């Protein structure tokens, strides 16, 4: 990237980056029929958007893991059962879990009622209401779906098959968002300025760093 960082993401690894005032990076995935990954963007508060860019690699062996009753939880960020995650955002305090659930197993997670919570189902299927049935196809959520949950203090799932999903929860910033391609700011004017800087080669603010 434009900070001079480079690395290889292997099976189970994680990459964390703060774009801040501007960073240009390139990803070159190796072709594979079995590759599975997720890229999540967290919006920074307006007052922190122009912070210095940062980057870090997190190895799979450094990610805390909890295994019990047919459920495996990898704690990427936040805290679960007294264990802190592999990293913590400086500006956004988020719970980020990678969960694997055996078929017919149940798992629940207490959440902050003031936070937004969503999951993305990598594979498998499940129900999210104890009053629903995994035998009823209309009650079951399938793989490759993102699910945003409403207000509440407990997340609950029962797997209708072996299932893997990521869970993310954080307090909403409640600020406007202007998004265009790889850039997220707060207003259309800021977005226009950012693209002008890209065209003029002034987007990267640390001019002593070379690509």
PLM features: residue spans?
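Jelly-roll (double-stranded beta-helix
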Residues: 1-211
């Amino acid at each position: 990237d434009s900070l001079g960082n480079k690395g290889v993401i292997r099976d189970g690894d994680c990459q964390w980056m703060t774009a801040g005032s501007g960073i240009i990076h390139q990803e070159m995935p190796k072709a594979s029929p079995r590759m599975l990954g997720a890229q999540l963007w967290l919006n920074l508060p307006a007052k922190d958007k122009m912070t210095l860019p940062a980057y870090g690699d997190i190895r799979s062996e450094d990610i805390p893991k909890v295994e019990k009753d047919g459920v495996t939880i990898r704690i990427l960020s936040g805290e679960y059962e007294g264990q802190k995650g592999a990293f913590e955002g400086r500006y956004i305090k988020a719970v980020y879990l990678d969960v694997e659930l055996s078929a017919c197993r149940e798992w629940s997670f207490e959440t902050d009622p003031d936070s937004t919570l969503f999951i993305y189902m990598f594979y498998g299927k499940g129900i999210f209401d104890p009053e629903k049935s995994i035998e009823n196809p209309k009650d079951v959520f399938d793989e490759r779906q993102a699910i945003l949950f409403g207000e509440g203090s407990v997340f609950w799932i029962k797997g209708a098959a072996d299932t893997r999903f990521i869970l993310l929860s954080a307090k909403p910033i409640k600020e406007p968002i202007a998004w265009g391609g790889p850039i997220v700011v707060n207003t259309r004017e800021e977005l226009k300025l950012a693209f002008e800087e890209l065209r003029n080669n002034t987007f990267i603010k640390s001019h002593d760093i070379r690509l």
